Every structure is written in structure tokens, then in C-alpha cells.
Amino acid sequence: MAVRIGLAFNLKPAAPANPAGANSESLSSDEPPSRSYRPDLQQPDLYAEWDEPATIDAVVRALSTVGQVYRLEADSTFPARLALIRPDFVFNIAEGLYGPSREAHVPAICEFLGVPYHASDPLTCGLALHKGRAKEILSYRGVPTAPFIVAHSPAEARRAKLPFPLFVKPAFEGSGKGVSIKSLCRNRSQLVRQVSHLIATYSEPVVIETYLPGQEFTVAILGNGREARCLPIIGMRFDMLPNGAPPIYGYEAKWIWDTPSKPLEIYECPADISDPLAEEVRAAALAAYHALECRDWCRVDIRCDAAGRPMVVELNPLPGVLPDPRDHSCFPKAAAAAGMSYDDLIRTVADIAWRRISGRSLLAEVA
């Protein structure tokens, strides 16, 4: 009998084209939507982390080769539908919508109903989304991360003791939301202005951290425990940004400089770095993965400090998986560099989760 797999997802609503001259700096998301999508400027990044039909269809097609798939949109009907269908396990790519614990909603509902699920548990999902709490745990566990504070008001930013330059971002958002060239603050006036803007825009605390001027990398991790492994490292090619632009992959790079007619080829995989640095990057990524007790898969963002030492920036236990190779979706890019097709990636992740849940190989059951 085929394994019954429930796919939990959030479907991105249709949105009008982005008007010419739009300048909202909060359009960016954890990774850019596909090139066909432009967000509604009335709610510029509210749904930025949700998936388009093409992504959901691609995941369904891949999972259908290893089981019977049930689509479970993670809306208000999700708990009742999950209780009714009761799949053998849930493959979770749902990001949630409201609150700092939104990425924990689906796994928490699964646990409440006793339905096994893939990827990290509610605690890990909540901690990873709260950048301040995640950095506290990383620091306590000795995982390298930049010095930081969490500011709840402009007054706290004004009293910050960290040396400039500093980098600021919302505490509870995906890695791109609220990140722009204005996030790099070189003096107290810029810092207070940007912190004020982010608090007013997102109604949440702001992480203020030492700016890391070195190379930036993304590491895709698969597996659990000692079997956790890194896929080829992705490097950020900041030399592809316009002349004079600061080395920041934020709103401007995702929405202004990267266009369908002139793609910004900023990702390089495998990254062109020395073997010793690559080993340090992988070690830092795995240390962070284990410190937050991630499961099955995760993406870890890393940037080097002024001395060239890798520092963990943040973790994403619900990484994006856009199927179009032209899109900047890191996990599929890393998988492709490892010789895996998109379907191979999704099947492998499902197999990793099913082995953890049942002790059996999902791939072997359909062989």
C-alpha cells in the first residue's frame, strides 16, 4: 500500500504587476518569488514567503512518485482536513501568515492531532524565525555569530554600544523582509532612522548586529544526527551588483536590479573558495543546525567577518524550493550542483523524514 503523504502549503494569492517606479523596500522575501510574480503594493510582503501554484504542483509531482499525495492548504480549514484525511505523514512547506510563531503553526497542529510530519518541530521553527532568540542559542552553544542586540524601540537603538558599522533587520521575518541597502548603518542617525522605520512597518523588535563585511554563503543541509550533510556551498557574487552598491542582497538586488530581461546572476554554486574556508563554513552550518535541533533539512546563511571567519547569520528550517532553474532558489541550486534533479531533491527529503518517522525507506518501498 502506498504511503499517504499530506502536503501542507500556503498558496500565494494572485497579485497585480508591480507598477513602474515602486519603491517599497519591504518587497523582498526569504528568496525571490518566481519571475512571473510581482506583489500587491497594498500588502507589499505579506504573502512573500508563500508559494505559487507552479511550486506546489512541482512538489506534488515529485511526491507522487513515492506515495499518494493529498493537498492540504494551511488555511483555517487545515486542522479539520488533516484530522479527516490523517495521512501517514505531512510534508510541510507552509510558512504561516500571522505572528512570530507562524512557521510553527503546521507542525504544532500535526503534533496536536498525532500526525507525523517532515522537517523541524514547533520549537525549532519558532526559534529560527526569531533571529534574536536564535542568535542567543548559537552564542550559548559556541556557534560563531556576530555580536548583536535586540531593540524594541528607537531609544534602545540610540543607546546601543556596538561599534559602527551596524546591520539592522526585523526580528521575526524571513531573511529578506525589511532588508535593503538602508539596513547598513554607518552612524547613530542612520541607525535610529532605520530602526524607527522597521518597527513602524513590522510592529516587532529589530535585530542590530555588527556588520560583517566579508564573503556570504548559503549552505543547504540534508539529514539528521551524524548523517546530516551539506550540499555544495552557494556563494554570493556581490561583484555582479551595480558599481558602488554595498554588498547586500536585499530589496534592491531582488526587485530592482534583477529583472526577467536582465537577470542578476548573483549566486555561484559551488562557491569559488578555498578548501579550508569551505570546511569552516560547513562546520559552522552544521553546528548551527544541531544547536537549534533542526530536522531533515535546513538552509543556513553565513557571512564572514573582517578577519575572514565564517559567522552564522540565520537558519531557515523551511527552505524555499522554487522549481524553475532560472529563479534564485538556493536549495534546488545546491541540489543540482550535487547531481540531483528537482524531483530527486523532494524525494530525498521525504525519504529522510520517513526514515526518521518509521525507520523505513520511502524510496525502497516504491522500488
Question: Which role does the model predict for each range below?
Answer:
Residues 1-118, 123, 128-129, 140, ...:
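ATP-binding N-terminal substructure of ATP-dependent carboxylate-amine bond-forming enzymes
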Residues 69, 116-117, 145, 166, ...:
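Hydrophobic beta-strand scaffold residues
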Residues 188-283, 304-311:
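Phosphate-binding site of ATP-dependent enzymes
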Residues 166, 223, 235, 316-317:
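Short beta-strand elements
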Residues 1-8, 39, 83-86, 125-216, ...:
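Active-site nucleotide/adenylate-binding loops and adjacent lid/helix of ATP-dependent enzymes
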